[in-house]
């Protein structure tokens, strides 16, 4: 591969443009730098910025099909070969506090042995781990190592999010055992997050597996083995997602059953109350007709005796219900 001049990839509004020093560190890219396989360049762009969009549309360093892919609409994770270069689309967890985590962030990467061009619109938090390692001098030394570290960081964030969802499901199951129903929409959001994760992480696992099996010239055998380990780890996370989705289905049925039982219990209670007070209601209505005068209306103890009879009647009905095991 021919060397690239630093001025050819130095975009003014880039998120950052760095050169890997081959020892685990980076330095800012300068126009006089020479980019080759020993000192590759990482150019990270926000494709909605004007200068970045113009560079993506005009640079001769990228194949025509790659230009549109790096600045196009979000797609599912995939990997495509373009001659000596490789286009990779990945998804990562959105950890921003003002947005929902199920809205995964897309990151697109085109790379060969000399150049790494990554684009995004929303911030990719998983890249902070790789950036931190590079700034400390403990990061990747070449393009293959960079890709493995990025995929590892993305998988770490995905695994943490899956674990958080799993913990929520455990808490929800414990609450259901205590007959505590979650707030309206809680289970639906949890299930949606799991389904969205399943939708994007399954093809991303396939991307990792393909990168591990492809004989890319800028990846060593050790890096391919690490990539396969990452694919296997994400596969275990997908198994956990499948189990969680099944458990949410069971919990939805359990919640419906608990709500039905609560409704039946309340209806039963109201029916018993109506049965207890039905005789007393009949008597008070009968005495209140007042067609032939109220019985005992002229006796000073008439009302007291009537109240005592009502209490005895209600007690008798309640006792009968109790002995009949309705109460």
UniProtKB/Swiss-Prot annotation:
It catalyses: Zn(2+)(out) + H(+)(out) = Zn(2+)(in) + H(+)(in). One of its GO terms (molecular function) is cobalt ion binding. InterPro entries: CorA_cytoplasmic_dom, CorA_TM1_TM2, MgTranspt_CorA/ZnTranspt_ZntB, Zn_transp_ZntB. It is a multi-pass membrane protein. Coiled coil: none annotated. Residues 295-300 are periplasmic. The keyword Transmembrane applies. It comes from the Bacteria. One of its GO terms (cellular component) is plasma membrane. Residues 1-273, 322-327 are cytoplasmic. Keywords: Cell inner membrane, Cell membrane, Ion transport, Membrane, Transmembrane, Transmembrane helix, Transport, Zinc. SUPFAM superfamilies: CorA soluble domain-like, Magnesium transport protein CorA, transmembrane region. It holds the Pfam family CorA. Signal peptide: none annotated. The keyword Cell inner membrane applies. The chain crosses the membrane at residues 274-294, 301-321. It is found in: Cell inner membrane. HAMAP family: ZntB (MF_01565). Zinc transporter. Acts as a Zn(2+):proton symporter, which likely mediates zinc ion uptake. Belongs to the CorA metal ion transporter (MIT) (TC 1.A.35) family. This is Zinc transport protein ZntB. It comes from Shigella flexneri serotype 5b (strain 8401).
């Amino acid at each position: 591969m021919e060397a690239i001049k630093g001025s050819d990839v130095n975009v003014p509004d880039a998120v950052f443009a760095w050169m890997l020093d081959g020892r685990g560190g980076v330095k800012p890219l300068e126009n006089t730098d020479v980019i080759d396989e020993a000192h590759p360049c990482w150019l990270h762009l926000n494709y909605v910025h004007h200068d970045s969009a113009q560079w993506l549309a005009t640079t001769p360093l990228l194949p025509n099909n790659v230009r549109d892919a790096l600045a196009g609409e979000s797609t599912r994770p995939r990997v495509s070969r373009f001659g000596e270069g490789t286009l990779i689309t990945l998804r990562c967890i959105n950890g921003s506090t003002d947005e929902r985590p199920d809205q995964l962030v897309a990151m697109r990467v085109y790379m060969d042995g000399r150049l790494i061009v990554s684009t995004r619109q929303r911030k990719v938090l998983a890249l902070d781990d790789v950036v931190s390692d590079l700034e400390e001098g403990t990061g990747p030394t070449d393009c293959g190592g960079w890709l493995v570290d990025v995929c590892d960081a993305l998988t770490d964030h995905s695994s943490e999010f899956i674990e958080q969802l799993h913990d929520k499901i455990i808490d929800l199951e414990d609450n259901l055992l205590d007959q505590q129903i979650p707030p309206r929409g809680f289970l639906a959001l949890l299930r949606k997050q799991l389904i969205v994760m399943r939708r994007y992480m399954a093809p991303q696992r396939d991307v990792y597996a393909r990168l591990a099996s492809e004989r890319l010239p800028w990846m060593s055998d050790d890096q391919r083995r690490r990539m396969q380990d990452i694919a296997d780890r994400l596969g275990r996370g997908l198994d956990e997602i499948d189990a969680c989705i099944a458990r949410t289905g069971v919990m939805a049925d359990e919640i419906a059953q608990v709500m039905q039982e609560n409704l039946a219990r309340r209806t039963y209670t109201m029916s018993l109350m109506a049965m207890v007070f039905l005789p007393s209601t009949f008597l008070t209505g009968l005495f209140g007709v007042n067609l032939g005068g109220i019985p005992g209306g002229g006796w000073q103890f008439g009302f007291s005796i009537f109240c005592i009879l009502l209490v005895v009647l209600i007690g008798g009905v309640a006792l009968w219900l109790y002995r009949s095991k309705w109460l």
